[in-house]
Each structure stands twice: as structure tokens, then as C-alpha cells.
Amino acid sequence: MNFETVIGLEVHVELKTKSKIFSSSPNAFGAPPNTQTNVIDLGYPGVLPVLNRQAVEFAMKAAMALNCEIATETKFDRKNYFYPDNPKAYQISQYDQPLGKNGWIEIEVNGKKKKIGITRIHLEEDAGKLMHTGDGYSLVDFNRQGTPLIEIVSEPDIRSPEEAYAYLEKLKAIIQYTGVSDCKMEEGSLRCDANISLRPLGSDKFGTKTELKNLNSFNFVRMGLEYEAKRQEKILLSGGVIRQETRRFDEATKTTVLMRVKEGSEDYRYFPEPDLVMLYIDDEWKERVRASIPELPDARRKRYVEEWGLPEYDAKVLTLTKEMADFFEATVANGADPKLASNWLMVEVSGYLNSEQKELHDIALTPESLAGMIKLIQNGTISSKIAKKVFKELVEHGGDPEKIVKEKGLVQISDEGALRKIVLEVLDANPQSVEDYKNGKDRALGFLVGQVMKATKGQANPPLVNKLLVEEINKR
């Protein structure tokens, strides 16, 4: 029997407001434990929450960017559960009247585009963070308690781990472009839980789902879903039954491990938050927030193709993160050829960032210095090969590319007389390669070019070298 995988994702995104959602405590990552919390966050008797207007507007902005309908009336509810990181024994969330609903985003996998529905987006407060000491104790850091969150719940439209990965990439890009969150998974400002079930191929009835947690990277989401699909398939093929449960992805074994039997929404005993009034959002407020939404990834991608003639693939890669897209545009604004700028960012810059495990803002390279180096390639001062030496200096130490080229003696040799002399020496030293080229073996010319480049320490002008070699060979 063949099965179809059905996946839905729940993504929590921390909003980067200056203060928390219901209190004046600062909202910043990395402070010493329990230094960014107050009596409201900790649920002391008699204290009352006050809703952060900026958090509401950030949530609206994200929901609009994800094509959601924005509620005219919405409210907050208490989600009741006991856990050490939840000091009030309830979480202020939204239950039956979310801020946004019926949204969608478009993903692309293997060249095929597909819309993934978004059921709802709602606002809630984050919980504290448990820190396990390893000697039998657990400590609680309440700095995160009360941080404003949006939970983005997808429709069960995702049919493979690859689609889940593409959905998360696109969702992250859109949220980052709006500026409401930095979406750093390593800091917990973007977290994902996945629901997965299997059903017989062709059936429209959903199977029993399991929820996956501890998915700390997009790759772990993909690996966790791949493993869980195989685990469920094995159970079903052997005549077993899937239980509704919550499982944890184990990073060491790359498997999923049972955490608990899954609770239903009735277990949380939701009821309206008595300390917060209904929230009314009129059309004027909606339009003001909508007007603040910047150009989003798809629009930018289209503009790069139409305005600068970039291939679709290049435009897609460059717009995947706002930081890369901004860097690219600034490089072009400083006079670099768009296609050359695209190539350098996609190959050399991205390669360096991946190998060093860094972000663009961590390196010394600037759009101005990259543009300056590209202009040196364009005007023939340096070759692409020499440019890689300049790039290494710029990315590690920064500086003026023109000054680096002069100080290190990297100016490309374009003097025809000087190069012709070297070409003749190379031809005299390699008569067999000359003969091979004359006999139709084009590779021989590449070898001879390499010998000239070697003799000039890579500083010869490659097109001129090719021209001179062909001229001199034809004379022999």
C-alpha cells in the first residue's frame, strides 16, 4: 500500500518590540537570567496586563504580508496549564477569535509552484526558559516570559519534508522583510512544531497525527519529518495503529522519541481573559499598517528579473534573505554590474559565509568595497582570478580594493609587448602542445594559457593571452 504524507506546521515568531506584550519589561535577547522581568510577567497577585500596541501592529503587519484577513474584533484568552516555566499557571493567548486568518504563501519545489494555506495567526505571550544543570536540578530564566509571539498555523497542505523546508524558508524571508522579527532560530526567535500523519494514497480522510518538537533548524525539521513518515509507514504496514502523541526529535540519533500522549484543546480549559477588553481594529488602522509593509521577496525577485535582467534562479537566491538582497542592491547602486554583483554574492560571498559559519554582518566586506572590486574587473585593472585574492583581503580585513591592488602589486598585465615575449617563451618550451592545438586538440590551448598565467603569477590579461597565443601559433 502507498501512503500520502500530510503535514501542517506551527511556527512561533518572537516580535522585536522594545518591551513585552503585557508589561514594560525590556524585550532583548542575551541579558543575565531574570534581569528582564517584573511582577506582571511573574503573575503576582493584583497586577494587571496592559496590551502593547506595537505588538498588535507588528502582528497585523506579518498577517497582512502572509495574505491573511485581519479581524475587526479580536480578544485574548487564558490557556491553562501547569509547568515550571509558566509562573501564572496560564498563558495569555488567543483561542476562537485570532487576529488573522485564511492566509497563504506560495512555495516552489523542483520548479513547481504551490500555495500553502495559513489557517490563522494569533498573538500570545512566550513562556520562560528551563535550564537543566545536569546534576538533577533545573533552573528557570523568566527573561523570555511575556515576550510577544505570533503563532502561524498552516493548513495541512504540505505533502513532503521538502515542501515543509521550502515553506519555512519562504515564511522566514517574508517575516524578516516586514522587520517585525529577526527570525533567528539559534536565539529562539523562530521556533517550529510539526504535525504529521499518513493516509492511503487517494484518500481524503486524515490519519492520526503526531506532533514533533525540538526542531531547532530547518534541516532538523526535514530530518524529523522524514524519520517520522518512515516510522508511521512501518507501523501501518505491520497492521499497527498510530497514537496521537507528542514526540521529540533527537539530534544525536536523528530519530523521534516519545514525550507524552498528545493533549486536546479541551485540556487547556480556554476561557476569555478577564483582565483585557475586546480589541477593535478599524479600517483606518488596518490601512495605516498595510502602508508600512515594505517590498516583499516575490515583488523584489520579479523586479530583479525585469529591471536588471537576472535569471530567475539568481533573483530567487538573492531575495531569500533581506540582508543579502539589501547588500546586492547597495553594491549595484555603487556602480557594479548587476550580473557580476549577483555572481560574486552567490558564489564567493555565500561560499565564504557557509565555510566560516558567519552572516553578512559578521564580515568586513561592504557593498562599497565589493562594487569597487567589481569595477576593477570591469575596467581590466584586475582579472577575475586576481580578484579572488583581493576579495579575501576585503572579506577578512576590509579596505579600499584599488589601494589593495596597488600595494600588493596585483595590477593585471595588459602590456601586449611584455605578454607577447612571455607567450613566445611558453610556446618554445612546449612544442608538443603547439602541435596538438594545430591538430585540433583545443585543450592544448588551455594548457598553454595556464603556463602563461603561471609565468605571470596569475596577473596576465586572460583574453589578451588567448589572442596572442593563437596569433603566434598560427605563425608557426
UniProtKB/Swiss-Prot annotation:
Q: What class of enzyme is it?
A: ligase
List, alphabetically, the Pfam families matched: GatB_N, GatB_Yqey
GO terms classed as biological process: glutaminyl-tRNAGln biosynthesis via transamidation; translation
- State the family it belongs to: Belongs to the GatB/GatE family. GatB subfamily.
Subunit structure, as described in the record: Heterotrimer of A, B and C subunits.
UniProt function note: Allows the formation of correctly charged Asn-tRNA(Asn) or Gln-tRNA(Gln) through the transamidation of misacylated Asp-tRNA(Asn) or Glu-tRNA(Gln) in organisms which lack either or both of asparaginyl-tRNA or glutaminyl-tRNA synthetases. The reaction takes place in the presence of glutamine and ATP through an activated phospho-Asp-tRNA(Asn) or phospho-Glu-tRNA(Gln).
Q: List, alphabetically, the SMART domains matched.
A: GatB_Yqey
* Presence of keyword rRNA-binding: no
Listed EC numbers: 6.3.5.-
Gene3D superfamilies of this UniProt entry? Answer: 1.10.10.410, GatB domain, N-terminal subdomain (1.10.150.380)
Natural source organism: Geobacillus thermodenitrificans (strain NG80-2)
GO molecular-function terms, A-Z: asparaginyl-tRNA synthase (glutamine-hydrolyzing) activity; ATP binding; glutaminyl-tRNA synthase (glutamine-hydrolyzing) activity
* Keywords, in A-Z order: ATP-binding, Ligase, Nucleotide-binding, Protein biosynthesis
User: Can you name this protein?
Assistant: Aspartyl/glutamyl-tRNA(Asn/Gln) amidotransferase subunit B
Cystines in this chain: none
Reaction(s) this enzyme catalyzes, per UniProt: L-glutamyl-tRNA(Gln) + L-glutamine + ATP + H2O = L-glutaminyl-tRNA(Gln) + L-glutamate + ADP + phosphate + H(+); L-aspartyl-tRNA(Asn) + L-glutamine + ATP + H2O = L-asparaginyl-tRNA(Asn) + L-glutamate + ADP + phosphate + 2 H(+)
Q: Does the keyword section mention Transferase? A: no
